[in-house]
């Protein structure tokens, strides 16, 4: 997948709103593989909706979203399964980790789908983000900031053309935010992928090829 295109997309909930000044909604926007994008939004402007459209969880919009030249509304369940396994990695704002499983088990569930990383590579990620001592601790016993780091590791243990990170550092201090951003970008460069980061304020401090106001 080389491009994600939004062609005049508008959530149904905003259809009667004539005052939309978004740089995404009702516009033609192209996200290219290899580039980094920051999508900034105020509360209630559709940030979570935007992410749900890209990952295929919702389709309640007018206009077109294309993966390369393919309209995503024509995609079937099997197509989406493959996209989420091979093309788009999604770091959920709400994380969606399994609290009864350990940090390593949460990551390994994802890694088993493709066998993309070795156990040693995964452990190196934990070490780098300062949570090696949490490797075998149940996620439900960890702080939200620690859980965010586990979720980032999980997002990086698969092949992808784009990584979609929804408010990835909301509960991290500047040092941990920087470390997580650096690790993400190293994996992105290894894979030649694109990055879409969303934020309603705090975001990873790094170079963005384009900043869009939702």
Give, region by region, the residue ranges found by the protein language model.
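Helix-to-loop junction immediately C-terminal to a conserved catalytic motif
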Residues: 55
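Conserved ABC transporter NBD signature motif
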Residues: 63-72
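Conserved ABC ATPase "signature" region
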Residues: 71, 119-134
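Conserved ABC ATPase signature
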Residues: 138-142, 146
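Hydrophobic anchor residue at the start of the ABC signature
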Residues: 152
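Catalytic Walker B motif of ABC-type/P-loop ATPase nucleotide-binding domains
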Residues: 163-166
